């Protein structure tokens, strides 16, 4: 899980979702998991 100020999709399978007022990226590749900090 990478925590970044600005998150973006890395590949085509990345999905931007909103959980508990936080924007997150979920992907089939675990290296692409991100959360806005």
Swiss-Prot record:
GO biological process, one term: translation
GO function terms (MF aspect): structural constituent of ribosome
Alphabetized UniProt keyword annotations: Chloroplast, Plastid, Ribonucleoprotein, Ribosomal protein
The keyword Chloroplast appears for this protein: yes
Cell compartments where the protein resides: Plastid, Chloroplast
GO cellular component terms attached to this protein's record: chloroplast; ribonucleoprotein complex; ribosome
Superkingdom: Eukaryota
Database matches in InterPro entries: Ribosomal_bL36, Ribosomal_bL36_sp
Name of the featured protein: Large ribosomal subunit protein bL36c
